[in-house]
Amino acid sequence: MKRVLSAAVLLPLVLIVFILGNTYVVDVFMGIVALRCIYELFHAFEQKGHHPVRWVGYLAAIAIMFIHVIPEHYAKYAVISIIPISVLILFILVLTKKTKTDVIDIAITFFGVCYIVLFLMFMSIIINMENGKFLIWYVFIASWLTDVFAYLTGKAIGKHHFTDISPNKTIEGCIGGTLGATLCIILYTVLINKFAGFNINVAVISLIGIILSIVGQIGDLSASAIKRYAGIKDYSDLIPGHGGMVDRVDSVIFIAPFTYLLFILMF
């Protein structure tokens, strides 16, 4: 019941932000999501005695809120510069011995900036593309409906265990999730082709749907692998019935950059 109630609150919020909100609203929303995710990720690693540099991750997450405030020409350089600037700051901290940070902590902090901030930043990039208001829903369809169909298929016919990283996942569930999400992506494409004037090739979008669904499941398992390493069940109890923010967007984190890349390459 908690899971359903949480979804009933979160779904309208996402719909409002991504349908009614402009680019800047989406940027702020994704920046807040990234901030929470960075907090949860670093907290997970701290359970194993690591000391990631939180403020570097927080600053990188806040940067998402401003990527469309500055002129586009300069924004590209700002995005590219996040990684080298972050690494430089981290090594300065180690070399000057100002904190407990060591090389492993640098790697974890750098990983957090890439995994959370840069990957989620593609949500803001997609929404700012031509027809981005329509394209962004491929991310959500691939993420949400893979989860839904994987759960339903696994419950109905799941017999073969998939991986120890996530004991409840079955091979049948994974396949069912991909097939169900891909069919929904095809249906969405047919609808926007007919009613919004798009001309997206259904065969190509079918391939993209399969890839995005698989990538999303890898994202889910990757987040689970980190939890397993940290010895935690959920990243937090922020969202009743769902766990933390990372638990809720783990597949979106992986799907977003691949959605952008595949649409750039194939259309």
PLM features per residue range, with description:
Residues R228-S251:
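Interfacial loop-to-transmembrane junctions
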Residues L145-K155, G216-R228:
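Short helical (or helix-break) motifs at transmembrane helix termini and adjacent helical loops
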Residues G177, R248-V252, F267:
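A short, conserved beta-to-alpha structural element at the edge of catalytic cores
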Residues L261-F267:
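Juxtamembrane boundary at the C-terminal end of a transmembrane helix
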Residues M1-I210:
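Membrane-embedded alpha-helical bundles of polytopic integral membrane proteins
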Residues S213-I218, M245-I253:
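Hydrophobic transmembrane alpha-helical segments of multi-pass transport and channel proteins
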